[in-house]
């Protein structure tokens, strides 16, 4: 890729932003392998194979590894995706145990939570993503004989468009508290679209709604140096992707502060603490150099709609 993002650009699971979703699914597949598997996502591997990108198939098959890379070797990548996946899994489990029966997975990609989590009876799970991505995953999992464990409703729309209207048209109930996830999404939105995303979530959320996302307190987290580090790793995989072409740069509002200002009670979970909680050693120097001081965020809407 030699050109940056444009308004209205689209993709499937093998192109552009979609290929990074497949990369994440490949990591989940690796973390789900073997007798000492860190995750249990049996649908990740067949989805990756169905996409058909050779580097990710080689990763899943154990034929491609970078043992000298403290962040990108097979074990480190499995631990990194395990920390992230368990955080969002636990978020949804806790939210539904607290009585929430409506969930929205923003930029759902090849996420399989609607198929693999034990959702309580009556739970409705909405998935929002690009039409090509939604169609690919739905058709592939149907061909595999996989069935959702909740009522799954798909909303095929770009998050830069009027997705709130599409969500309501899909049956979303604004009177019910909702569990929202925005996982691995924010760098792919322009700074103003990030704010608009949280504004829309707040406007659609009844009191008691919850939100999980990532949070980098540095408003200039995606510097040229950090993007170059990410791109170098992608290109070592054999992917002709440049992070500077996919991520939107520019100063952003700090997620935790912005949500607090919208009436959310925000609890940050620093990545290093989640690594320790999972029994993993945190790759301190390399993680900070590449991603900054990243935290995961669990927020609860305490008041009325903003």
From Swiss-Prot:
Role description: Exhibits S-adenosyl-L-methionine-dependent methyltransferase activity.
Family annotation (Pfam families): LCM
EC numbers, comma separated: 2.1.1.-
Recorded family membership: Belongs to the UPF0677 family.
Signal sequence interval, chain numbering: none
Binding site for S-adenosyl-L-methionine: 129, 158-159
GO biological process: methylation
GO molecular function: methyltransferase activity
Keyword entries, A-Z: Methyltransferase, S-adenosyl-L-methionine, Transferase
Protein name: Putative S-adenosyl-L-methionine-dependent methyltransferase MAV_4442
Originating species: Mycobacterium avium (strain 104)
